[in-house]
């Protein structure tokens, strides 16, 4: 009475209840009394000039946060490796980079009976 590979005995509790509607829901948060909520949301008076100055740092301060040698913009922040072995350089060994799309032409004709 052996089970085959990949055969489950069934049952058990799943952690994927959010996908399959698995019964238990999160308990609802208790509502605070309205009077207490109003007291908590009333902020102390603050000067608008101090808030505006703290919220928007100057361009010089923003430049200080960027590490030296990094030239980037907010729109293009992808990391590009820059070292002696990056880009076009000559070696005495063939490249292992894949030059053909899947299902397309291939330089591996010696394996697959090339055309």
UniProtKB/Swiss-Prot annotation:
Disulfide bonds: none annotated. GO terms for cellular component: cortical microtubule, transverse to long axis. Keywords: Microtubule. It comes from the Eukaryota. Residues 29-48 are annotated as: Disordered. One of its GO terms (biological process) is cortical microtubule organization. InterPro entries: SPR1/2/3/4/5. The keyword Repeat does not apply. The keyword Cell wall biogenesis/degradation does not apply. Coiled coil: none annotated. Acts in maintaining the cortical microtubules organization essential for anisotropic cell growth. Belongs to the SPIRAL1 family. This is Protein SPIRAL1-like 2. It comes from Oryza sativa subsp. japonica (Rice). The lineage of its organism: Eukaryota, Viridiplantae, Streptophyta, Embryophyta, Tracheophyta.
